Swiss-Prot record:
Residue span(s) of domain RNase III: 17-146
PANTHER family, sorted: RIBONUCLEASE 3, RIBONUCLEASE III
Species name: Staphylococcus saprophyticus subsp. saprophyticus (strain ATCC 15305 / DSM 20229 / NCIMB 8711 / NCTC 7292 / S-41)
GO MF term list: double-stranded RNA binding; metal ion binding; ribonuclease III activity; rRNA binding
Organism lineage: Bacteria, Bacillati, Bacillota, Bacilli, Bacillales
Biological process terms in GO annotation: mRNA processing; regulation of gene expression; rRNA processing; tRNA processing
Protein's name in the database: Ribonuclease 3
Keyword annotations of the record: Cytoplasm, Endonuclease, Hydrolase, Magnesium, Metal-binding, mRNA processing, Nuclease, RNA-binding, rRNA processing, rRNA-binding, tRNA processing
Pfam family, any one: Ribonucleas_3_3
Length: 244
């Protein structure tokens, strides 16, 4: 492809990028960093550019920055969870499927600079390519604006993923609640199924968690296990608030 084509692609990128940063309410100084973050190796190869001008180094940095940011968030949000649980949660957030979800939330793949062949073969929607670009963007944002800007971005795009219970099954709230009760010497914990309704293919279970002889909270779920997890999560929050 010609240099004129390259100029057109870069100009289009810059226009889209500026608009995207306005939408995200993020400041930026070094457009060149972000251009590199969205430059796939196929784009670099098509125009015979420096082989290190693609986004893989920024992807490397962004991965580390994401792990740090998410680690701090989980550390603060779940003060009673042991290291093993936090590690599992972080791995669920900082992984290809989740990063693709985050990128698609804000149509970040529309900014990726691709070579002609990669574009034709569907590279713009390829999960590995999209997740790599997301990490590279975070790396560029960190270099340009610092960790605080990455935190601000994460509050918009990443942390709600946790707040909206997208991590069900990773956090064992029954264990978390049991350990908390044990530390507080509150007594014995039991669970009781109090309702089961709906057709066989779409059952809804309601369970309650009982501390000593008192019902603390209820939870609903598609399985008995899920309803107990929900009840434990609510009970844990209730007790923590009482003891705060």
């Amino acid at each position: 492809m010609t240099n004129q084509k390259k100029k057109e692609m870069v100009q289009t990128f810059q226009n889209k990028f500026e608009k995207k940063m306005q939408e995200l309410n993020l400041d930026f100084n070094r457009v060149d960093l972000y251009q590199q973050a969205f430059s796939h190796s196929s784009f670099i190869n098509d125009f015979n550019m420096n082989r290190l001008d693609h986004n893989e180094r920024l992807e490397f940095l962004g991965d580390a920055v994401l792990e740090l940011t998410v680690s701090r968030y989980l550390f603060d949000k779940y003060p009673e969870l042991p290291e093993g649980n936090l590690t599992k949660m972080r791995a669920t957030i900082v992984c290809e499927p989740s990063l693709v979800i985050f990128a698609n939330k804000i149509q970040l793949n529309d900014l990726i600079l691709l070579g002609k062949g990669e574009e034709k073969t569907g590279g713009r929607t390829r999960p590995s390519l999209v997740s790599d670009a997301f990490e590279a963007f975070v790396g560029a944002l960190y270099l340009d604006q610092g960790l605080e800007a990455v935190w601000q971005f994460s509050e918009q795009i990443i942390f709600p993923y946790v707040e909206d219970d997208e991590l069900d099954g990773v956090v064992d709230f029954k264990t978390q609640f049991q350990e908390y009760v044990h530390r507080q010497n509150k007594g014995d914990v039991t669970y009781r199924l109090i309702n089961e309704e709906g057709p066989a293919h779409h059952r809804l279970f309601t369970s309650e968690v009982i501390l000593e002889e008192d019902a603390v909270a209820e939870g609903k779920g598609k399985t008995k296990k899920e309803s107990e997890q929900k009840a434990a999560e609510r009970a844990y929050k209730i007790l923590k608030n009482k003891n705060a």
